[in-house]
């Protein structure tokens, strides 16, 4: 069944919707949910950005973070040292493999 409008014909039957009628119902519910969420205010103090509601990951990189205080240079030196040790282990493994095969 179709109804005609000034711009052309549009099908009204639910069976013609892509994915069937259940998909159309899900899409409609999702649109209603999105409009309801966008119209409502923050759900709680955490969503409103109240003090003390910062995620833990962001606290790791601030001066107020609890725990170890490590200088960025120390982190870089340890990182490069770890990468170098892995590189050297690969080289040693190749050398040992070469001598073991002879």
From Swiss-Prot:
Compositional bias (Low complexity): 41-52
Species of origin: Schizosaccharomyces pombe (strain 972 / ATCC 24843) (Fission yeast)
Name the UniProt record assigns to this protein: Protein transport protein sec61 subunit beta
Entry keywords, A to Z: Endoplasmic reticulum, Membrane, Protein transport, Translocation, Transmembrane, Transmembrane helix, Transport
Superkingdom assignment: Eukaryota
A GO CC term assigned to this protein in UniProt: membrane
GO biological process: post-translational protein targeting to membrane, translocation; protein insertion into ER membrane; SRP-dependent cotranslational protein targeting to membrane, translocation
Subcellular location: Endoplasmic reticulum membrane
Topological region Cytoplasmic: 1-72
């Amino acid at each position: 069944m179709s109804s005609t409008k000034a711009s052309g014909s549009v099908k009204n039957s639910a069976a013609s919707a892509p994915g069937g009628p259940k998909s159309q119902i899900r899409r409609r519910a999702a649109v209603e949910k999105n409009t309801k969420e966008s119209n409502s205010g923050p759900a709680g103090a955490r969503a409103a950005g109240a003090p003390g509601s910062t995620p833990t990951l962001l606290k790791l990189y601030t001066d107020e973070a609890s725990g170890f205080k490590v200088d960025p240079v120390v982190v870089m030196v340890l990182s490069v040292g770890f990468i170098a040790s892995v590189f050297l282990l690969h080289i040693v493994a190749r050398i040992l493999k070469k001598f073991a095969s002879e």
